[in-house]
């Protein structure tokens, strides 16, 4: 019998206006979720839509973009400055404000706590993921398009300081530690200012980095995409390549014996399976799943 992981509904999207749609989710350094929400963008084209229709949709900007975030149990909605954030699909806390990035051309916007643009950084073109730390470090992971396209993305994962200067390049680190280089970084977990974990294509090792030094590495640990949580000696992740018949899946794996892998069902507090497609987001031990209708948080004590 498959394992069960219990999730609590964190936010029901029915509380949003009808023309609001969650376009991106992340986790901040406090372990709380961050949601980028589009206002007024048309629904995504149907499954039989043409490529041209999908491109038009992708290039259609929303009327406004909002950031929903939490401080403790207090929920806040912030409308972002139209000169920043509209074309972004990454969000993180940054100092007293916000970092909005991931768009084409490498532009990353630094905004104050009111969502007003203050300055821009160039962190490379279209990173897979961006995660920040409370001391101002910016970790960016890159896809194969950037890895093989030249530029800073060729290093697979890069850590930048608060001014946008590269202070750690994974390709150099991998060579120094006899690790495979990154072809495409599928998942990254920046636990805190000292600790970072990576899972990447094509060998799919699990690599633990502490203070920019190799802590531990497991060869051929297995694919995890797009996120994983570290709970002691256990890893919780979304299973790769398994969107079979419209159903996402989770895995629970032991770090101490990586061969011990078991499928896990996501259930709510009433024991009902969270069915259909969902997307995982994580940071440290904090793990959430995002469906079309709600955001759920893993209950770690159950």
Predicted regions and their residues:
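Repeated scaffold domains used in trafficking and secretory/extracellular systems
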Residues: 17-30, 43-44, 81-95, 123-135, ...
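Loop/turn-rich, solvent-exposed surfaces of beta-rich toroidal or solenoidal domains
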Residues: 184, 199, 218-262
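Blade-loop segments of beta-propeller domains
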Residues: 46-96
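A short beta-strand motif characteristic of beta-propeller blades
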Residues: 9-16, 73-82, 115-122, 166-179, ...
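Beta-propeller blade signature
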Residues: 51-71, 110-112, 152-165, 248-258
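Conserved beta-propeller blade signature
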Residues: 34, 98-99, 138-139, 196-198, ...
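Blade-level signature of beta-propeller repeat domains, shared across WD40, Kelch, NHL, RCC1
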Residues: 279-302
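Short, conserved, GDST-rich strand-edge loop motifs in beta-rich repeat architectures
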Residues: 36-60, 139-155, 242
């Amino acid at each position: 019998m498959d394992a069960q992981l219990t999730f609590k509904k964190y936010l029901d999207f029915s509380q949003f206006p009808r023309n609001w749609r969650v376009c991106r989710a992340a986790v901040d350094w406090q372990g709380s979720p961050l949601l980028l929400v589009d206002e007024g963008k048309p629904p995504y084209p149907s499954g039989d839509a043409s490529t041209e229709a999908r491109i038009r949709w992708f290039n259609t900007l929303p009327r406004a973009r909002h950031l929903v975030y939490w401080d403790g149990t207090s929920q806040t909605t912030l409308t972002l400055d139209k000169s920043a954030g509209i074309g972004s699909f990454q969000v993180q806390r940054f100092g007293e404000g916000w970092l909005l990035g991931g768009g084409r051309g490498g532009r990353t916007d630094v905004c104050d706590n009111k969502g007003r643009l203050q300055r821009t950084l160039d962190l490379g073109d279209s990173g897979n993921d961006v995660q920040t730390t409370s001391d101002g470090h910016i970790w960016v992971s890159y896809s194969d398009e950037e890895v093989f396209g030249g530029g800073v993305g060729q290093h697979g994962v890069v850590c930048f300081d608060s001014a946008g200067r590269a202070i750690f390049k994974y390709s150099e680190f991998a060579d120094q530690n006899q690790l495979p280089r990154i072809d495409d970084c599928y998942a990254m977990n920046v636990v805190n200012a000292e600790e970072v974990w990576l899972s990447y294509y094509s060998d799919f090792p699990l690599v633990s980095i502490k203070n920019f030094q190799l802590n531990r590495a497991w060869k051929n640990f297995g694919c995890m995409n797009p996120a994983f949580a570290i709970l002691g000696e256990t890893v919780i992740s979304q299973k790769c390549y398994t969107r079979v018949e419209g159903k996402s899946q989770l895995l629970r794996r032991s770090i101490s014996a990586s061969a011990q892998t078991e499928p896990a069902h996501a259930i709510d507090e009433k024991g009902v399976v969270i069915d259909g497609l969902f997307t995982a987001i994580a940071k440290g031990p904090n793990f959430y799943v995002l469906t079309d209708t709600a955001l759920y948080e893993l209950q770690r004590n159950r």
